[in-house]
Amino acid sequence: MVRRLLALSRPLYWLYEQRLLREVKRGPMPRHLGLILDGNRRYARALGLSPTKGHEFGVQKAYEVLEWCLEMGIKTVTVWVFSTDNFKRPPEEVETLMNLFLREAERMAEDHRILEHQVRVRFIGRREGFSPEVVRAIERLERRTEGHRGMFLNIALGYGGREEIVDAVKRLLLEAEARGLSPKEVAEGLTPEDIARHLYTAGLPDPDFIIRTSGEIRLSGFLLWQSAYSEFYFADVLWPEFRKIDFLRALRSYQARERRFGR
């Protein structure tokens, strides 16, 4: 009986997905979509699996969602993969994640989806704490795709929103010192635009829309500066379970909102 119901539900699911897809494609898309990929470990725990398996499922879902973004014509996507706080996790889990980052960076450099769709990949965050092998792999991927003019994909690795702002201020002060400016001169002339020009995402539009999975209703420091006027959507589903219908519903919610930008 259960199998029969499942068999009957699949065509209905597909029909609903196609109707939703047509509806959403008619509306405006975010220029820059932020994704907080949350829930891999809880998903694995619910299935009685190791955290490593949860992260493996999460990687495959990330590729799937990237394809959805390409289909919808979203030009810039930032995915938060690993925070500075994640270094505090058990050493064996961190080591597993490092191996996963190395493998996927090498894989993406040859991935036909990245190459065919001209996806430019850039990693944002601090690289201290990552092995030389991981750093070389992500730098190779960045070089391999730096001439691409399709989607711009930021992968936030070793990222923290507070750390990003601190790093931006440090760079700004060092540049000012090199130009012979005093701290007083820097303080008197400092503007929000000066800070923005030194962020990891400098030159890119701020995120219009940020989706977080797992039901957690917080940013946890993701793109703190850039998200001042972002719209948010908190999906009550773990990242590996995030379906295309969930993605389309999120975009539909974004399209229904009136963005005021503080006015």
Curated annotation (Swiss-Prot):
The active site is at D38, N86. It comes from Thermus thermophilus (strain ATCC BAA-163 / DSM 7039 / HB27). Catalyzes the condensation of isopentenyl diphosphate (IPP) with allylic pyrophosphates generating different type of terpenoids. The lineage of its organism: Bacteria, Thermotogati, Deinococcota, Deinococci, Thermales. Its EC number is 2.5.1.-. Homodimer. Its cofactor is Mg(2+). It comes from the Bacteria. NCBIfam families: PRK14835.1, uppS. GO terms for molecular function: ditrans,polycis-polyprenyl diphosphate synthase [(2E,6E)-farnesyl diphosphate specific] activity; magnesium ion binding. Keywords: Magnesium, Metal-binding, Transferase. This is Isoprenyl transferase. Gene3D superfamilies: Decaprenyl diphosphate synthase-like.
